[in-house]
Amino acid sequence: MKVIFATIWLIAGAWSQSAEQLGCIWYGQSHMIGAHWVNKGDTNPARPLNSPTSEAIFAKRCPMLYKEYKGESGEDELSLCCDAAQIETMESGLSQADGVFSRCPTCTRNMALTVCAMTCAKNHTLFLTAYNDTNDAGVDYVKYIDYRLTDDTVSKIYNSCIGIQHTQTGRPAMDLGCGSYNAKTCNYRRWYEFMGDVSGDYVPFQINYKWSEDAEEGSNEIYLDLSPLKCGESYEDSYACACIDCEESCPLTDAPTGPDELWKIAGLYGVTFILALIIACALSFFIFWGAFGKTSAPSVCMPTLFGEFFYHGFRIWGTFCAKHPVIVLALCSWAIAGLSFGIRYMTITTDPVELWAGEESQTRIEKDYFDQHFGPFYRTNQMFVKAVNQTYFTHETSNGVLNFGPAFEYNFLKEVFELQDSIMKLGMADNEGLDKICYAPVLMAGETPTVDRCAIQSVYGYFQHDMDRFENSYVDSNNYTINYLNQLEDCLRVPMMEDCFGTFGGPIEPGIAVGGMPKVAVGEDPDYMLATGLVLTFLGRNYNDESKLEPNMKWEKLFVDFLRDYKSDRLDIAYMAERSIQDAIVELSEGEVSTVVISYVVMFVYVAIALGHIRSCRGFLRESRIMLAIGGIVIVLASVVCSLGFWGYLDVTTTMLAIEVIPFLVLAVGVDNIFIMVHTYQRLDHSKFKTTHEAIGEAIGQVGPSILQTAGSEMACFAIGCISDMPAVKTFAMYAAIAILLDFLLQITAFVALMAIDEKRYLDGRLDMLCCVKSGGKKINDEDGDGVDRPKEVGLLETLFKNFYSPFLLSKPVKVSVLLIFTVITCLSLMVTPSIEKGLDQEMSMPKNSHVVKYFRYMVDLLAMGAPVYWVLKPGLNYSEPLQQNLICGGVECNNNSLSVQLYTQAQYPEITSLARPASSWLDDYIDWLAISDCCKYNVTTGGFCSSNSKSEDCLPCERGFTENGLRPDAETFNKYIPYFLFDLPDAECAKAGRASYADAVIYTIDDVGMSTVQDSYFMQYSTTSTTSEEFYSQLREVRRISGEINAMFKENNVDAEIFAYCVFYIYYEQYLTIWGDAMFSLGMSLVAIFLVTLLITGLDITSTFIVLFMVICILINMLGMMWAWSINLNAISLVNLVVCVGIGVEFVAHIVRSFKRAEGTAQERARHSLNVTGSSVLSGITLTKFAGIVVLGFSNSQIFQVFYFRMYLGIVLIGAAHGLILLPVLLSLLGPPQKLARSSGAEPTASITITTN
């Protein structure tokens, strides 16, 4: 193939073409077609340009041609194939391109090469062929031309421009500049063919590009061949493109690596794996050594210093309360009444932010800062709509067969659009419509929004909410059907085309409007045409002042009610309004009342039956203790009410969840103490006591210390829970701690008094609940003080323990097996503990039947775009100073580590940083906007602002000044026109105008002379889709790392500025960044608290204390293993439950250890005795009571109840019982001392805690 290339900047003398070859194809302009001038056909040679203004434009836009034509001396006559008017038209066209591509000077200079050659080069006929026509005045004009270019030239120009970013949207500029193609589907030919297509709005006549690679063999046609520079290179007196727009200009930096990978063995955390293995091997060795060796077990002594102090104190106190029950009850009732009155001051919150984010947490501080300066994030009302018929289909076009997903089936789309029309009309009849509450960013200042101007993200916007346009269909000349699918193809591929803008004046993001496409790599755009569902988003204004939100709340309720009642055979809808989560929290609380009440009733019935010792149906009402059980439960609930009142006085906000769960928790704990006190009293040898109140005092003396130990441990653990920064958890812990304290105080006072009254009723032969009626049986009470002839009571459960369970458990083979099994299970639990996932599934916080649960599920399937991240830059910069501008901007001459460049660089690694696009930059767009002469306008009459598209004669271009290099506005210009930029709406001429994107992003003040000073501002950046807790907290961790690096850059440059990243979701996930550290601290502090409480209550008995501590640690480790096995995540709720586990674990251990300490005989005998007497009580009084109430929670409608209360509390009970009733007796039988340390008293030494059952 013979192709002749022409290089236009070779000096004219080097060309040997004839004069005819060097002629023009046009000169001057003939007339306008539409908004564009067309050129006169003219084949004469080039003519001199006699307009200094136009010559200056030509010199600026076409410097190479200018230098060539002016000669080396610069004095040659400038002869061109264009006149002054054509140069001005060329300038106008290039200015439009500047609005998109001006961020990269090399790109615009490269583009100008071919435009200048086409418009003015004096050798037109070498590479242009004109096709003329005659207008009505008989003047020849050029109708269209053939423009012959080499592929290499245009490819280089295209490559220099392909990386340019449109900073307002974070998209490539080529998305706006390649017609129906986006940056990924565009190429150099498609780009130039779009710029030559007369059917567009920007081309005055058709330009048919002829490509050198398509030239026929042997052709003598000449193709214009130029040498454009790469984007990283610069022309003389110009600049190379910046890093954001040109990868070649970016400095070499290390890619972010994310968090360090943990060392793992077999998928488990290596450190705990090896540690558990070592412990397992060591313990197994000692177990076998002890089992088969001849050495006897070590003798462990348990000395005490003041163990009797608590016994005597509680005995005296119990005796006093039993002797004066009326006074005690009166005083307690007054205290209860006084504290309960505080409930009237109690406040309950359902605000998710108030529930899950502490006021001093970093994300809460950042959220409050953002809300106060820029206003709170929009109120989002959103729908996900799936097609019931999930059938894919095709559509034939001139470009081939297109594949479409079920979301674009005609009847489905039509119904969705009709549904959207109905939603947009909600409330309009009552003047409470969407237009009253919606967010409308593209409005002139003072303009009142209409529904059409509301920001609604929906594919219906691609048809401008016009059903006729959607239904329009016809067959083109090639017999292809042109319908709504063609429009969808164009708009899904290039949403930045003006024909695809929504009625509100902005683009519809495909990633926000459609979903369910096949998965692609992170950072890649999916094939939107294969969507299986649609997303409709209605944005509402939000306010810090909640009183202004009433119209929003009304419309959102209309939205929810309408969609709840909407039925369709084609549409499967999930929806959520901004208010839905708060409504769901209220619904959750109200819905769980029945579950909680049933749980309480079950425990009450159990207590009422088990508390008495019923021997026959005839003596039921005498031997039952229903009234005592009711009194005990009332005391427990009174302690909860008093706790609510106590914190109400102190104005501590609480939640419905706390109000529902705390009574259950305190009831489970309090009922244990009821059993312990009653049955300890029943097991006494009453003949050794002169009066009933002395016997009761003795019972309280025996069990009081252990009750104090367990209550103190639980209260201390809840107090540790108050350290949590999460309000819902903190207030739960605070209320529970006081409730347990008050419950303890009321039980050792009021309940003791009730025991005395009930015992007097029993001894007098009166019936339970009918105390005025006496039974026909013998009266037991002995008024002469010679003792009370009441039989000792031994229950069935204790008998079973004594005759069967204890001998079996404490046999040598079983003890060895128990130790081995618990060693293996505990070590396995330790191995898997670090593998527990952090987080809280969003669905769990909602009722199962809530519409929000379905919304969360559909969000995982259909959401293709993440939430916006706002990089908030606090005051401290002088933006009018170029050196400080360079720290922020991303354009020419900006620092390579500037804020914008760093955010751009991080967005190149979305799989790590979760940043999907480069950030918008108001500063870059403002500088670009000022650089275009016709964008900034002012009114010469008023001196005020004029919009850039104003055609008024009173509106003239702003008087602007620039720095010496011409790149930046001077300080006066910069400060003067910031309000103009933020008031100006973008259009084709001034795409960088800032009102739509930045009206809320820049906070500024204006001084007396009209100069603006920027204070706070933000830079918005879209994130990748995040739906799990791990994705959200990983993103938060990364943006904090990035903001830290940017702040470090500010410090290096001695700038007192600070930046932070804000996203509306971060506030819920901050806890997971430190959850393991918080867990270790809280659990460690809880264990320390238990150690100190136990050491004190046991009279500084170090051995007993360590045994209790060791057992509680084992319970905790196995609880963590259960969490891993049962898929319970670690979060603030489960952490508090673990702290509760530590506290309640003491109950399963402390009573048995105390009983062992007081018993007589060898370690084996004492272990068997403590298991028979106290172990049976632990099973019936602690384990079964909690189990009865917990099982009911399994039927809860709340997943939080099911997972974090049913599963975890069930685990606490079962694991605690297993350790207390299986492992502990075995350990005590091996480690217990041979000597007797029991205290002698009037009571039977071995009498302890038991619950009798028949």
Swiss-Prot record:
Instruction: Let me know which tissues express this protein, per UniProt.
Output: Expressed in the midgut.
Q: Cite the SSD domain residue spans from the record.
A: 592-757
Lineage summary: Eukaryota, Metazoa, Ecdysozoa, Arthropoda, Hexapoda
Quickly give the catalysed reaction. Answer: cholesterol(in) = cholesterol(out)
Could you provide one GO biological process annotation from this protein's UniProt record? Answer: central nervous system development
What is this protein identified as? NPC intracellular cholesterol transporter 1 homolog 1b
List of glycosylated residues = N123, N132, N389, N479, N896, N939
- Briefly, what is this protein's role? Important for cholesterol absorption at the midgut epithelium. Acts only in the early steps of sterol absorption, prior to Npc1a-dependent intracellular sterol trafficking.
Gene Ontology MF annotations: cholesterol binding; lipid transporter activity
**Where primarily located?**
membrane
Q: Which Gene3D superfamilies match?
A: Multidrug efflux transporter AcrB transmembrane domain (1.20.1640.10)
Q: Which UniProt keywords apply?
A: Cell membrane, Cholesterol metabolism, Disulfide bond, Glycoprotein, Lipid metabolism, Lipid transport, Membrane, Signal, Steroid metabolism, Sterol metabolism, Transmembrane, Transmembrane helix, Transport
Q: Which family does it belong to?
A: Belongs to the patched family.
